[in-house]
Design a protein with these regions (language model features):
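Glycine- and small/polar-enriched repetitive beta-structure motifs of secreted/surface proteins
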Residues: 1-195
Length: 195
């Protein structure tokens, strides 16, 4: 770990926590885990995996488990990311839970991503374009809301639920492939198999 005022750090792995100079209570396990030059606001983070939390600078109370998990995250608090490449391109994220391979992996935002829950393979995946305004969205299931780029307050539960929706807010889709063909949708309630 760094040499200034780092306190209570645990680092296991090549280059883990190497540049941290003023953080406290961080745990990094894996090659380059939590290895960015970090400010004294970097507190109580846990990063386990290859390049997990690689760019963290000032983040607090986040848990990242899996290769490349939160590797572009520079700031934010209280994120939980489990799985390879979870939340891997978001730079500012707050209060998010991402569980599963590539879950929320391509969410890039000009503003902070806040209050999202994504569970399942590539749930709420996003794309490499500028993703904005998806706050307070829930995506549970294989590919649920996986191309959403703009639209807050959505809830999709079920494999492929809302899987074609790129734009739209305040939708509720429940069931296998529910709302799977709607590219742009707002304020809908869709329940049932392929509804």
């Amino acid at each position: 770990t760094g040499t200034n005022s780092s306190i209570g750090q645990v680092a296991i792995g090549s280059s883990a926590l190497t540049a941290l100079t003023n953080g406290t209570e961080n745990t990094a396990v894996g090659y380059q885990a939590l290895s960015a030059e970090a400010s004294d606001g970097t507190v109580a983070n846990t990063a386990l995996g290859f390049k997990a939390g690689l760019s963290i600078n000032g983040a607090k109370e986040s848990t990242m488990v899996g290769a490349w998990s939160c590797d572009a995250l520079t700031s934010g608090t209280k994120n939980t990311a489990f799985g390879s490449s979870t939340l891997s391109t978001a730079t500012t994220a707050l209060n998010n839970t991402a569980l599963g391979y590539n879950t929320m992996a391509n969410v890039k935002a000009a503003v902070a991503v806040d209050g999202c829950v994504a569970i399942g393979y590539e749930a709420l995946l996003g794309n490499s374009s500028n993703t904005t305004g998806i706050n307070n969205t829930i995506a549970i299931g294989y590919h649920a809301l996986n191309v959403l780029t703009t639209g807050a307050g959505n809830s999709a539960v079920g494999s492929w639920a809302g899987s074609a929706t790129t734009t739209g807010g305040y939708n509720t889709a429940f069931g296998y492939k529910a709302m799977a063909n709607a590219v742009t949708a707002a304020s809908n309630i869709v329940i049932g198999y392929e509804a």
